[in-house]
Regions:
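Hydrophobic helical membrane-anchoring modules
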Residues: 1-3, 8, 22-29, 151, ...
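Active-site beta-to-alpha loop of glycosyltransferases that engages the nucleotide-sugar donor
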Residues: 7-21, 42-45
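A structural alpha-helix within SAM-dependent methyltransferase catalytic domains
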Residues: 20, 24, 55, 83, ...
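Acidic donor-binding segment of Leloir-type glycosyltransferases
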Residues: 23-67
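Acidic metal-phosphate-binding loop of nucleotide-sugar-dependent transferases
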Residues: 43, 73, 98-100
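Acceptor/aglycone-binding surface of glycosyltransferases and processive sugar-polymer synthases
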Residues: 63, 67-85, 90, 102-179, ...
């Protein structure tokens, strides 16, 4: 298996159908073995129809697998479960809400294949989402650059798709179950001296769908960043 990409489908329901169909059409242009992993994990007791819809997609589209498990965490848990399920030499992740252009997968994959990078991701140069989302992203990236050395050249921590070599992912000890997982991937690359590259993209609006990013997100991000710093410093002291 050359390439696997996990699609985060949480509570997308019918809205995931055109995204997956378009992504599948683009992936079909690849002349090697590939797969899509539809991550449709769900909270027990919810009426979320996403797992059922993803299973229907997998029945009619080849090279599509579905991961539908009772959730034990938030977005980060889904991302880790999806990446763990990927079988390719190169693995990646993208949100299934349609805000990130699926064509960016081609650009990222071509770059990581042609050059000696361990991770290739995107950064958003033109955003069509809300002022609220843009403000949160700006503040978060600024805090990230202030708190973590070596991150200054990175423009956009949370942007996707993220595509990496399988052996690079195997070295990462990701723990976060929520929105901090994107940051953990970047921090792992910095800590492990892995080579990263960013490609510019246009970021689309959510349309009528409500964002899952709450106003408290910045405080949660800051809390996680400080906790990560504390753990890192504690491990250094123990090593010495």
């Amino acid at each position: 298996m050359e390439f696997s990409i996990a699609v985060l489908c949480y509570r997308a329901e019918e809205e995931i159908i055109p995204f997956v169909e378009n992504l599948h059409k683009i992936m079909s242009l690849f002349r090697f073995e590939w797969e899509l992993i539809l991550v449709a994990n769900f909270w027990q007791g919810s009426n979320d129809r996403t797992p059922e819809i993803c299973q229907q997609l997998a029945k009619r589209l080849p090279y599509v697998r579905v991961l539908a498990e009772p959730k034990q965490g938030a977005m980060g848990w889904d991302m880790r479960r999806g990446l763990d399920a990927c079988r390719g030499k190169y693995i990646g992740v993208i949100d299934g809400d349609g805000q990130f252009p699926v064509e960016a997968i081609f650009s990222c994959f071509a770059k990581i294949k042609s050059d000696d990078f361990d991770l290739v991701k995107t950064y958003r140069v033109q955003r069509r989402d809300s002022l609220y989302r843009r403000l949160i992203s700006t503040v978060y990236n600024w805090l990230f650059h202030v708190l973590f050395r070596g991150s200054g050249k990175l423009r956009d921590v949370n942007s996707k798709p993220k595509i990496m070599r399988r052996e690079a992912y195997a070295k990462m000890m990701l723990q976060s179950d929520d929105w901090f997982t994107d940051a953990e991937i970047i921090l792992s690359c910095i800590k492990l001296n892995l080579r990263m590259y960013e490609i510019p993209i246009e970021f689309h609006s959510l349309g009528g769908r409500k964002s899952f990013v709450k106003p408290s997100a910045i405080l949660q991000f800051l809390k996680h960043m400080l906790e990560y710093q504390f753990r890192s410093r504690s491990s250094v002291r123990k090593a010495n």
